[in-house]
Amino acid sequence: MSLKIRLARGGAKKRPFYRIVVADARAPRDGRFIERIGTFDPLKAKNAPDRIVLDAEKAKDWLAKGAQPTDRVARLLDGLEIIKRESRNNPQQGQPKKKAQERAAAAAAAAEKAASEAAA
């Protein structure tokens, strides 16, 4: 049984409210859970003290028992300095793709050819 520390959505339509729960990975998102360890209200200001309410001791206990936090919960726990979340790095994300590079190379070659013809 693999355990996850994840968000279970509550609240009304367009007014989300999340419980931070420990649940079996196979259980439904908003369904059965083992223990509720906190709450998260995304509508509150980022610096509001009650935006994230979490029992840090329970979170540490569950992490020690092998529960895996989801990406969003890992971000929240990192913000509370409970765990250290590794930052993701994709240096190729902003680079042009293959066809765009080919077009740029063709345009550069055409510009160079035009410049050499104008100089001659």
Swiss-Prot record:
Q: Which cysteines are joined by disulfide bonds?
A: none
What Gene Ontology terms for biological process does this UniProt record contain? Answer: translation
Q: Biased-composition ranges for Low complexity?
A: 103-120
InterPro entries (UniProt xref): Ribosomal_bS16 (IPR000307), Ribosomal_bS16_CS (IPR020592), Ribosomal_bS16_dom_sf (IPR023803)
Q: Which GO terms describe its molecular function?
A: structural constituent of ribosome
**Which region ranges are annotated with the description Disordered?**
84-120
What is a single cellular component term in the Gene Ontology annotation?
cytoplasm
Q: Which Pfam families match?
A: Ribosomal_S16 (PF00886)
Which UniProt keyword terms apply here? Ribonucleoprotein, Ribosomal protein
PANTHER family linked: 30S RIBOSOMAL PROTEIN S16, SMALL RIBOSOMAL SUBUNIT PROTEIN BS16M
Q: Describe the family membership recorded for this protein in Swiss-Prot or TrEMBL.
A: Belongs to the bacterial ribosomal protein bS16 family.
Return the protein name: Small ribosomal subunit protein bS16
Which gene carries the instructions for this protein?
rpsP
